[in-house]
Amino acid sequence: MKTLLHICCAPCANQCVATLRTEGVEVTGFWYNPNIHPFTEYRERRNCLRAYAESVQLPLIEQNDYALRPFVREVAEDIAGRCVKCYEMRLFQTAKTAKEQGFDSFTSSLFISPYQNHELMKEVAQRAADTYEIEFLYRDFREVFKAGQAYAREHEFYMQKYCGCVFSEEERYLKTNKIIP
């Protein structure tokens, strides 16, 4: 089975790739993350992923749309509910690309995170699969999250401190009282 794996970052991807390869899945990575801001953060995560992909011979498709304005426009009306829009943007584009490029299925490294809303992501991914008539390969990768983080530290990957959007970065600092609201 040929699967297109949407990748948010190398620390999340490494154990997803390893798990899928162990299952005999032929994995190709897909970088599409218009939610990641600022540009320096976007570039750092993308470059780390490129290095990781090369080191494990992971084919990588990049859709380098640094899209601050379109992303903010998409989520501005409901900042608190932005995650569903973010999942939709990335998972629908992954399904579309997978279909267009002849893959059997798609999935995402987002499913490794204990911090993401798995049920919501599954629902969005299934809608994307139905829309583009391609299989959504669901795997709950959370059990290998810690192994992925350990691998990332061992290989000196860039380790981000927030999910990617400027709003999650703001929340990170508000929770630690590092900025004044």
Language-model features: locations:
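Nucleotide-activated chemistry modules centered on ATP-dependent adenylation/adenylyltransferase
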Residues: 1-181
